[in-house]
Amino acid sequence: MTAPDDNSIITATAPAEVYDKKNPFPSNLKRRVLLNKEGSDKETIHLEMCLAGSGLEYRPGDSLAIIPTNSTQVVEQVIEAGGFDAGETVELKDGATKPLNEAFASDLDINGVTKNILKKYNALAQSEKLESLLDPGNKAALDDYLWGREVIDMLTDFPVPGLSASDFCGTLRKQLPRLYSIASSPKAHPDEVHLTIAVVRYHSHDRDREGVCSTYTADRVSEGETMPVYVHISRTFKLPEDGDTPIIMVGPGTGIAPFRAFVEERDAIGATGKSWLFFGDQHRATDYLYGDEWERYVGDGKLSRIDLAFSRDQEHKVYVQHRMLEHAAEMYSWLSDGAVFYVCGDAS
């Protein structure tokens, strides 16, 4: 080992920052596109997000976790329903303190209600009506109540005069990340990750309601702004190592996302294995997600076959399972030849 002379400069390289669930990466939203055409009953968006400088790596089949914030409207509604002071300082379970409106916006899940949350809340409410609902003999009634209801419903249905904001926060879960199947190949889109998200908006129990994360990505983050994200690795949902292996992919609705990544990846590496895609949605004219891409892949021979099922384009509804039954013999032949079978379902 040689000692440096007096003019030498010794530099140390700082360890690269690791981005994960505890330390998410602020990913810049580069582009957001509505995939459905005019006249559709659905709202499905395509996101392109920047990962440059993050050190985050993913493979087709992995998911991207997004940690959303709650909408200002919902925060204000919950504060009003509970009779709280928005600026009151509250202590969270991790010991942190902050104004209530900030805690509701980013730290706590102020939407979904569970049986456990109702139990914790009733320790404060001491409501006979809620106690009856929680009785083991009333399971059907409890399940019915929990369906489609949220924290604001709990506050209005079982009000507690003078409820402590800090005590109430103790009944809630922390804001959880939402996982979305990645819809891109890093080989096709270096330093980017793409997502396909169904935006949830509906009316239930006399109120307009919305999906927390889907509307966060659609409404509350503008292009050029950032979202906290990290990669969730899949140990099982991945392409076969051998590019000659045939694959069958079934992805109705937003279930198409990982298969866009699969086809892009196989195209990028020059895989020669056959590929067969089943896709379905409501109407071909308005809901054929990434339709131009699929048609191009088929035309170029990069996708061996595609079978489509648009449920509302004829009098009797047709779904992907019907197309699979129609081609059962050929599917069996593919599987006998070693094809790997994948299904990614649309939650709806």
Please report, for each region that a protein language model flagged, where it lies by residue.
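FNR-like FAD-binding dehydrogenase module
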Residues: M1-S348
